[in-house]
Amino acid sequence: VISLRRLFALATAAAAASLAPALALADPAPAAGTLLTDPGLTPQLKILALLTLLSLLPAVVLTMTSFTRVVVVLGFVRHGIGTQQSPPTQVIVGLALFLSAFTMAPVTTAIARDAWEPYSAGRITAEQAVAAATTPLRSFMLRQTRESDLALFYEAARQPLPQTEEEVPLRIAAPAFVVSELTTAFQMGVMVLLPFLVIDLVVSALLMSMGMMMVPPSTLSLPIKLLLFVVADGWHLLVGSLLRSFA
């Protein structure tokens, strides 16, 4: 089970790392981690720096974790079955968050071990903690990123391709990762929608052959699709496929 402290460490590290290029181009100023630990700053400024990092949490969850793939595939399932509001959007998002937390467990564990705990104990600086936290997060994203998507952003940035993954900055790894996640999610969505599409076509053909053209096909196809999904243990197969896709 992933603790809230580990999730907070992941979000803080990713947010600080994503801000690093912009901070480097700006006028010399304390880094995000330094703002939280500088004894010369007032508590109000420290709270402001912390709230700034927390405001980036939704962007971190959407662009640097497995959440995007999971929530898109779950949305395709609901659309394919034809139940517009069941399961509710809140349930889909909640399930996607918990599945994302489960798949990101090795990353958060590595961040807590290599970055958060040493930094909390005062053994490393804030900059060293950000660098240590970035390594497992970047490694996870690059494992799920297609080379063509990564090359696309390097070409757009007019930079040579890196030789090692340590040379890939998060400002390039994150968008390439999101594009790859959307591609994978749509591929899985096609496989999910095909059986439901076949049922819709068969039901429509049967209704037309029986002269019942005024009967909406969804009236008969919805119970059949629900029955098929339940008999096939659809949620078990779906969640298992999603988890294995990140292995």
Where are the model-predicted features located?
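N-terminal secretory/membrane targeting signals
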Residues: 1-27
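Hydrophobic alpha-helical segments and their helix-loop boundaries in membrane
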Residues: 6, 23-247
